[in-house]
Amino acid sequence: LKEEIIATSASGLAWTIVYIALIYRGLKDKSYGMPLVPLALNFAWELVFSIIYPPSTTGIAGTIINGIWMLCDIGILYTYFRYSYNYFYNRYKITKLTWIGLSIFAFIVSFEIMFIGGPFFGQFKYYFNGDIFQGAIFIAYIQNLIISVCFILMIWERRDSKGQSLTIGVFKCIGTGLTVGIYYLFWQHHGKAALMNIIVGVTFLLDLLYILTIYRQLITDGFNPWKRL
């Protein structure tokens, strides 16, 4: 339990830095840094698993961290709804009403996934010990894999660094694979969680690729990667 609280707290701090950096860069660049799908999944996860199904093993510490993340997500939501429509219009030529409808639909579906998914995975006692929040952790790692893919695709599609920074990439990597990822695989499951080994391992490699990609893009855009928050 002590190791879990340490890993969760370290991950919570790292991801809070990621969220603050996303908000800061979004406002500074008048852009948005988290694509719609991972943003909707993230917000729904933190809403459901801090209020409806709060963590049982990490207690109040886990609930507070999830609550802080949910509040940070509101800031990221602002940058998305404030600045993303132009990107959608330029790329897909959709109307603002269509964009709003698709965005709302993404958030509704994400909420349903989290609300139903936690209990669904939690029912498998052999792997998740009948604990809904253990199911939530599994969902979170799949979600993190999606985030990593979307971050890379966003840079490749935009061909600029707006809304992004090396800070986001480095602390995402720390907050996922190098903290709770290590705990989950080697302390809790002793390296025997084959599927999670693949998910966490691939996510870690994609995070390294994202760090390299944003570093090169910042150089191309004329920024010092180490001085851009």
Predicted regions mapped to residue ranges:
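Non-cytosolic membrane-interface motifs at loop->transmembrane helix junctions
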Residues: 58-67, 127-137, 168, 190-200
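Hydrophobic cores of alpha-helical transmembrane segments in multi-pass inner/ER membrane proteins
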Residues: 14-15, 68-78, 143-150, 202-213
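C-terminal transmembrane-bundle signature of multipass membrane proteins
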Residues: 150-157, 166-229
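Membrane-interfacial loop-to-transmembrane alpha-helix junctions, especially the N-terminal start
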Residues: 27-39, 161-168
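Hydrophobic alpha-helical transmembrane segments of multi-pass membrane proteins
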Residues: 34-52, 66, 172-181
